[in-house]
């Protein structure tokens, strides 16, 4: 529910411009605070000529102090910013709703829906929790290690989305053509009619389709116009730690009608894109499970390390 409508001193008001950006209305003295809070140093900034020449402070600012725009996925960070400073936060309802909207998940209904999919194997407990979390929050980065079944989580999320929002297309963005084919193959093995429902885009492939799901490399679509992205209601980024920040931001910020956004990755260490940027585009990070836990349960084989001295 939106916070109180009573405007108190230092109240920060936030509303949705679209499903990519929030508009943040704050008092003049709060703007520099917001700009500094939502900023970070670029790796190796000290070696950049603009920094050496004192024309740049080495930071990327995610809050635009001119337009007052901030990525929707940073709403929880904005809440913390206000809470730490005891600034009242007011939610403004727009045609897009408000940034704190959540779904109530009826687990009995969700289980029945998954049974109706006739999946080749049931969801593991952590996979079900990830799907439930994604549905409830509408946007999230799901952090789950290799071998944990991220594509199966993705498949269940998009099946739920198609069942509830059939009028909008789904875009799945991956970093390589091999991952396009791998996801296509995985969905086929899960029992989905991929020939009828999934379109693949990479070099040499047709860029337009009326199929409900598009799987594409980011390199193939990041230069497309905003109009091309307008019919997507759900976007999934697979292996998001491999995406280049400028290209990924360009894609995600043009998906103005994509209320549901899920980033999938096995790690956020050594990412090509800053974690704060990723969370702004997809939402807060949710750790699904860890390699150690999967090894203890027997899902993954335990490591046997031998040292050979040559």
Question: Where are the regions a protein language model picked out?
Answer:
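Conserved Walker A/P-loop ATP-binding site and its immediately adjacent core
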Residues: 148-162, 166-189, 248, 270
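Post-DEXD/H (motif II) to motif III coupling segment of the RecA-like Helicase ATP-binding lobe
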Residues: 233, 241-306
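Conserved RecA-like ASCE ATPase "motif II neighborhood" in helicase/translocase motors
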Residues: 213-251
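Conserved pre-motif I regulatory segment
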Residues: 59-63, 90-92, 96-143
């Amino acid at each position: 529910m939106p916070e109180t409508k009573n405007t108190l001193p230092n109240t920060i008001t936030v509303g949705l411009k679209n499903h990519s950006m929030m508009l943040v209305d704050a008092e003049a003295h709060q703007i520099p605070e917001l700009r500094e809070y939502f900023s970070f140093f670029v790796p190796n900034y000290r070696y950049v000529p603009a920094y050496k020449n004192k024309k740049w402070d080495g930071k990327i600012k995610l809050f635009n102090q001119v337009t007052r725009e901030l990525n929707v996925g940073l709403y929880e960070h904005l809440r913390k910013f206000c809470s730490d400073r005891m600034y009242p936060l007011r939610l403004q309802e727009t045609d897009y709703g408000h940034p704190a909207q959540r779904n109530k998940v009826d687990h009995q209904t969700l289980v029945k829906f998954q049974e109706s999919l006739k999946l080749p194997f049931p969801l593991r407990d952590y996979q079900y929790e990830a799907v439930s979390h994604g549905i409830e929050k509408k946007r999230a980065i799901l952090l789950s290690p290799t071998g944990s079944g991220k594509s199966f989580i993705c498949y269940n999320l998009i099946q739920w989305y198609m069942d509830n929002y059939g009028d909008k297309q789904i875009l799945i963005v991956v970093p390589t053509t091999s991952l396009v084919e791998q996801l296509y193959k995985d969905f086929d093995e899960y029992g989905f009619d991929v020939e009828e429902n999934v379109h693949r885009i990479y070099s040499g492939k047709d860029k337009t389709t009326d199929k409900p799901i598009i799987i594409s490399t980011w390199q193939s679509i990041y230069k497309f116009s905003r109009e091309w992205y307008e019919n997507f209601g759900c976007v999934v980024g697979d292996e998001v730690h491999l995406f280049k920040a400028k290209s990924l931001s360009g894609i995600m910020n043009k998906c103005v009608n994509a209320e549901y956004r899920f980033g999938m990755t096995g790690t956020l260490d050594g990412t090509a894109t800053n974690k704060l940027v990723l969370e702004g585009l997809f939402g807060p990070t949710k750790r699904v499970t860890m390699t150690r836990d999967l090894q203890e349960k027997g899902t993954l084989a335990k490591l046997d390390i031998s040292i050979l001295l040559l």
